């Protein structure tokens, strides 16, 4: 459940890192020894809608590794030296955002688009929130997590179910939960309006530019989301063949929609070298997609070879399915997807519904959503470049 605020950004991620790396009953040396001898690992991931702690172990070692996993979840230790090492890593990550032009651009875009929105909070520590990530606050956050009982246990593999149930009952089963009902935040979509381009300056972007065009896109629970994902994959190939291969505008272009409750879509150019014509060539590529023309290649005489969305649709569907669902072939991958389903959708089988929608998506749906979101929706430009570079954003420039 979305609990983070801008002031507590990074708190949950930091807590879960301690839960993955420490526990009361098992020293660091003992945990490392068990991990090495059993070829197992404990990790975590954090989203704005929730976090997950996971154990990856062979079935035959489950009875040896589960106690380590549960003790980390229930009894993480917050030793001062480990805390200081963690905080140093957080400070380095924050500095890394500002040192890298592309990361700083993405950070700025997120801050601008989510100002005053629940997603103004971040899963990672920020310059404004890091001072709040104290040992005391981490302990309190952990207590709240256990008291609310707002978590689920997901298991996959050929394991001894009697042992699992007995172990869970003797640990998590002894927790006393509060009667307070936890509700999910009502996360509203964001609105993006056409405005003057935002251009940042960075010494490491001297002689090049990173340019992003953003627009509002559908939430990952809406019917238009899957067609938009496929549209982005197809359009990325058109951008590559037009913007990079034909005109040599940049090193790499791409387009995609973010999967969340309040997302936005992106057209991004990585390492731009032509500062005057990038907008014009992007518009050309956009027009081809809107008119159902996939650019396959550029001929020797400079002309294009085209195909249609319908002609290529099955290939794009299969590619997306393989990239997204191939991890289900392992128990660890399956648990990861099931956990994500619960965190993001509160529905453990949601990926199966999306898989069916992928199979049913038509070329007409893809073209419709592309025109609606990429072409007709208002968009905003953001860029980062060197101190003296002038970027031509075309007709949108004010």
Task: Tell me what each language-model feature is.
Residues 115, 152-219, 383-398:
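An aromatic/glycine/proline-enriched structural segment found at the starts
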Residues 130-134:
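Short, charged, amphipathic alpha-helices and their helix-cap/turn boundaries
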Residues 1-75, 86-95, 101-128, 148-156, ...:
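M16 family metallopeptidases and their MPP-like homologs
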Residues 235-239:
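Short Ser/Thr-interspersed hydrophobic loop/turn segments at strand-loop and sheet-helix junctions
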């Amino acid at each position: 459940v979305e609990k983070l605020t801008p002031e507590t950004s990074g708190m949950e991620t930091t807590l879960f890192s301690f839960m993955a790396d420490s526990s009361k009953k098992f020293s660091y040396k003992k945990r490392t020894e068990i991990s090495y001898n059993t070829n197992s690992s404990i990790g975590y991931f954090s989203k704005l809608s929730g976090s997950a702690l996971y154990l990856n172990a062979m079935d035959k070692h489950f009875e040896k590794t589960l106690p380590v996993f549960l003790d980390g979840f229930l009894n993480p230790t917050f030793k001062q030296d480990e805390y200081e090492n963690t905080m140093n890593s957080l400070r380095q990550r924050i500095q890394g955002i500002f040192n890298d032009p592309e990361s700083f651009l993405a950070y700025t875009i997120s801050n601008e688009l989510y100002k005053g929105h629940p997603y103004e909070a971040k899963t990672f520590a920020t310059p404004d929130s890091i001072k709040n990530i104290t040992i005391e606050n981490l302990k309190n956050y952990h207590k709240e997590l256990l008291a609310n009982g707002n978590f689920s246990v997901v298991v996959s593999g050929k394991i001894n179910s009697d042992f699992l149930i007995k172990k869970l009952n003797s640990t998590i089963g002894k927790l006393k939960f509060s009667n307070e009902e936890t509700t999910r935040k009502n996360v509203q979509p964001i609105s993006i309006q056409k405005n003057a381009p935002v251009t940042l300056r960075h010494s490491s972007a001297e002689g090049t530019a990173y340019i992003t065009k953003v627009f509002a896109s559908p939430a990952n629970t809406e019917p238009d989301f899957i067609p938009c994902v496929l549209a982005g994959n197809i359009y990325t190939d058109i951008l590559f063949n037009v913007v990079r291969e034909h005109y040599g505008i940049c090193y790499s272009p791409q387009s995609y929609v973010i999967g969340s409750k309040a997302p936005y879509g992106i057209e991004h150019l990585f390492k731009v070298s032509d500062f005057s014509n990038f907008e014009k060539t992007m518009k050309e590529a956009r027009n081809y997609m809107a008119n159902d023309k996939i650019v396959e290649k550029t001929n020797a005489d400079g002309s294009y070879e085209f195909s249609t969305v319908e002609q290529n649709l099955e290939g794009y569907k299969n590619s997306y399915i393989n990239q997204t669902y191939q991890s289900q072939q392992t128990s660890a991958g399956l648990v990861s997807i099931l956990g994500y389903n619960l965190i993001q959708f509160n529905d453990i089988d949601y990926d199966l519904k999306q898989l069916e929608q992928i199979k049913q998506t038509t070329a007409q749906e893809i073209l419709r959503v592309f025109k609606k979101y990429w072409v007709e929706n208002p968009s905003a430009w953001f860029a980062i470049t060197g101190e003296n570079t002038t970027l031509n954003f075309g007709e949108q420039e004010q």
